[in-house]
């Protein structure tokens, strides 16, 4: 077995309400959104990851349990 050295960096996530995550006009969906962007859903206490860069790109809970499509 071989081990690879890695450098862990601090993950800086923005805290956003569930209402804003679901709103395609909210800044979290219209400003600097990209595939792989992480945000903290402060309403439901869960980490979300964007699937794409558009304002209607799906947000997935990182455990894969559910997704939110902004509308």
Model regions and ranges:
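Short beta-strand segments and strand-loop junctions that repeat across beta-rich extracellular domains
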Residues: 45-58
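Extracellular/surface-exposed low-complexity repeats and stalk/linker segments enriched in Gly/Pro
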Residues: 2-44, 61-71
């Amino acid at each position: 077995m071989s081990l690879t050295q890695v450098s862990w960096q601090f993950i800086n996530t923005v805290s956003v309400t569930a209402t804003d995550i679901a709103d395609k006009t909210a800044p979290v969906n219209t400003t600097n959104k990209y595939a792989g962007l992480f945000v903290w859903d402060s309403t439901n206490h869960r980490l979300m990851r964007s699937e794409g860069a558009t304002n209607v790109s799906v947000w997935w809970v990182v455990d894969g349990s559910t997704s939110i499509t902004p509308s």
